[in-house]
Amino acid sequence: MTTARYRPTWDLALEPLVSCKLCLGEYTVEQMTTIAQCQCIFCTLCLKQYVELLIKEGLETAISCPDASCPKRGHLQENEIECMVAAEIMQKYKKLQFEKEILLDPCRTWCPSSSCQAVCKLQEKGIQNPQLVQCSACDIEFCSACKANWHPGQGCPENMAITFLPGDSSSFFKSLEDDVPIKRCPKCKVYIERDEGCAQMMCKNCKHAFCWYCLESLDDDFLLIHYDKGPCRNKLGHSRASVIWHRTQVVGIFAGFGLLLLVASPFLLLATPFVLCCKCKCCKGDDDPLPT
């Protein structure tokens, strides 16, 4: 990966300018960065902001080339990312990569205790079946499948999709409590920590949206009607004005799309006969025998 170096302005004025695909600005070659794997080139500032944004939001895969039409579908290597971002952001990137590695490894899992969160090893023999796992750090014994306290001779409880395990290893999982900082995604079972803010949560692993308090799915609740009634009423964490503004934006988007279809429909109806006519002429021309 090439990085920018600064040179006197009189030298830069003589160099050809290269267009950045992200900001569409024109820069000298030395102000650009080339991704080694695919040779796509962007201005260094744009690529740096792109990488930092993905890391701060919590990436789920390797950082890919920002060009959606990249022919090689390249990815940034770790050394390229390290040259671009600050040390604390790079540390978070390595942590995210490690968490992803544990998530994909069938022989390793996280200790479910919120006060521990150590990595535990599973026995490779019978890995597809629930097995007893003992954390080497806090000595808690739990089920590898549902992460509940070990339950020999019993099936995994169906209501263990969302659980929270406090520091006391003798107590059972708590769920559906407003004050617990860690809960599990109802879809993929990954642990999610909520510091503060909005109660509408989105799992970074599976992109499932749900309510933090009652764990109900919000995937189809674009207007956040869920927080207008029931036990979660007015618990969204935003002012009433901000909720109304959000709903206005959503309704405006759908209304604009519908209006666009309404305006375009007469033109589509008028254009359809011409398209069909041209297609029929082309087909007729193909069927005519060649002159001899």
From Swiss-Prot:
Coiled coil: none
Residues noted as binding Zn(2+) 3 in the record, renumbered to the chain: C143, C146, H151, C156
One GO MF term attached to the UniProt entry: zinc ion binding
Residues given in the record as Zn(2+) 2 binding sites: C111, C116, C135, C138
Residue ranges of the TM segments: 250-270
Region TRIAD supradomain, residue ranges: 16-236
Residues at which Zn(2+) 1 binds: C20, C23, C43, C46
Enzyme Commission no: 2.3.2.31
Binding site for Zn(2+) 5: C211, C214, H226, C232
Pfam families referenced in this protein's UniProt entry, alphabetically: IBR (PF01485), IBR_1 (PF22191)
Stretches annotated zinc finger (RING-type): 20-70, 185-214
GO term, biological process aspect, one: protein ubiquitination
Record: residues binding Zn(2+) 4: C185, C188, C203, C206
SMART domains: IBR, RING
Entries under InterPro entries matching the protein: E3_UB_ligase_RBR, IBR_dom, TRIAD_supradom, Znf_RING, Znf_RING/FYVE/PHD, Znf_RING_CS
Chief location: membrane
Reaction(s) this enzyme catalyzes, per UniProt: [E2 ubiquitin-conjugating enzyme]-S-ubiquitinyl-L-cysteine + [acceptor protein]-L-lysine = [E2 ubiquitin-conjugating enzyme]-L-cysteine + [acceptor protein]-N(6)-ubiquitinyl-L-lysine
Membrane topology term: Single-pass membrane protein
One Gene Ontology term, aspect cellular component: membrane
Assigned keywords, A-Z: Membrane, Metal-binding, Repeat, Transferase, Transmembrane, Transmembrane helix, Ubl conjugation pathway, Zinc, Zinc-finger
Function: E3 ubiquitin-protein ligase which accepts ubiquitin from E2 ubiquitin-conjugating enzymes ube2l3 and ube2l6 in the form of a thioester and then directly transfers the ubiquitin to targeted substrates.
Comment, domains: Members of the RBR family are atypical E3 ligases. They interact with the E2 conjugating enzyme UBE2L3 and function like HECT-type E3 enzymes: they bind E2s via the first RING domain, but require an obligate trans-thiolation step during the ubiquitin transfer, requiring a conserved cysteine residue in the second RING domain.
PANTHER family: RBR FAMILY RING FINGER AND IBR DOMAIN-CONTAINING
Family indicated by similarity: Belongs to the RBR family. RNF144 subfamily.
Name the UniProt record assigns to this protein: Probable E3 ubiquitin-protein ligase RNF144A
Organism, scientific name: Xenopus tropicalis
Gene designation per UniProt: rnf144a
